[in-house]
Amino acid sequence: MARSLKKGPFADQSLLDKVAKQAKSNDKKVIQTWSRRSTIFPEFIGFTIAVYNGREHVPVYVTEDMVGHKLGEFAPTRTFRGHKKEDKKVKR
């Protein structure tokens, strides 16, 4: 179910504070966050945000096309190793 329009988009306040602080100081360090649920705002464009995927922080460079999406969409939590290869000797 989508978020109600009357509520508006959500972003973690600490993440907004970190982005505003770096924008003010013209600094482009990687911002670490655990907030996968935060919506990407236009103020985030040009920053690299390291999003936690459960094991490590995945660096995500924010572009204009990402605005409106969630940070967690760009840091996959599951790794697909491929389907098992079928053994041709056993199959008849």
UniProtKB/Swiss-Prot annotation:
It comes from the Bacteria. Gene3D superfamilies: 30s Ribosomal Protein S19, Chain A. Keywords: Ribonucleoprotein, Ribosomal protein, RNA-binding, rRNA-binding. Pfam families: Ribosomal_S19 (PF00203). GO terms for biological process: ribosomal small subunit assembly; translation. The keyword Secreted does not apply. GO terms for molecular function: rRNA binding; structural constituent of ribosome. PROSITE patterns: RIBOSOMAL_S19 (PS00323). One of its GO terms (cellular component) is small ribosomal subunit. Protein S19 forms a complex with S13 that binds strongly to the 16S ribosomal RNA. Belongs to the universal ribosomal protein uS19 family. This is Small ribosomal subunit protein uS19. It comes from Acholeplasma laidlawii (strain PG-8A). The lineage of its organism: Bacteria, Bacillati, Mycoplasmatota, Mollicutes, Acholeplasmatales. The gene is rpsS.
